[in-house]
Amino acid sequence: MKRALHVFLVGVVGLSLGLLAFSIVPTKNNAVSAKATAVALQPGEYTVGADINPGRYTVTPQNGSGNFYSDPKKSSGSSLNEVLGTGDPTYVPSVTANFKKGDKVKMEGIPSVQFTPVTKRNKNNTTMLGAGIWVVGKDIKKGKYQVTPGQGQSGNFTVEPKSMFGSSTNEILGDDTSAGQVPKINATLRKGDTIQIQGMSQVNFSKK
């Protein structure tokens, strides 16, 4: 009887320790991940996750103008190539995008660049977007739109569908038709589609 009781107690203790160990193992659901944090950077090359916290940022030059690049770690990611600054129609005053761990960021010719975390996104927007990478349903409402560049501006406008059966869009918006630019396009934006605007500080959307 004493031997049976001893075996039973050992089993109970072992089970309790096992449950305790299981309960404190971190899981993906309760793990804390780093949040986007404001930072100012000087010309050079940086790695997201080492020099910049991963997250969504609006990037602006604090003074001057120059080149801003980003190169995604994953081949499926989108790259950025903008001239940040003001005072020239080919410059953009800011660019907004997600920066993921392992992505490379490079600045040239700009004394200082400010990364400001995006804290709010306007899913009900139906009117305007600037340079950067945007998601339908998070930054603009889904629907049919007529899309036009801001006054006197030109640049690339692309839409990558979320669905493999969706249609992509790749146009150069602008008034110079002799250079292959188009002054307006009609686009159907579906939830989850990704929009990229390059070289333009403003693109106008008119819901149809």
Task: List each model region and its residues.
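N-terminal, intrinsically disordered, polar/charged segments of Gram-positive cell-envelope systems
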Residues: H6, S23-R56
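Short, surface-exposed beta-strand/strand-loop-strand elements in extracellular ectodomains
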Residues: Q62-S79, Q151-S168
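Beta-sandwich interaction modules
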Residues: T47, N81-F99, I133-V135, N170-R190
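N-terminal Sec-pathway targeting helices
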Residues: M1-V12
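Hydrophobic alpha-helical membrane-insertion segments, chiefly the h-region
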Residues: L15-I24
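Short, exposed beta-strand-loop hairpins at the edges of beta-sheets
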Residues: D103-P111, N186-N204
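Short loop/turn and low-complexity linker motifs enriched in small/turn-promoting residues
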Residues: I24, K28-V32, T60-Q62, E108-T127, ...
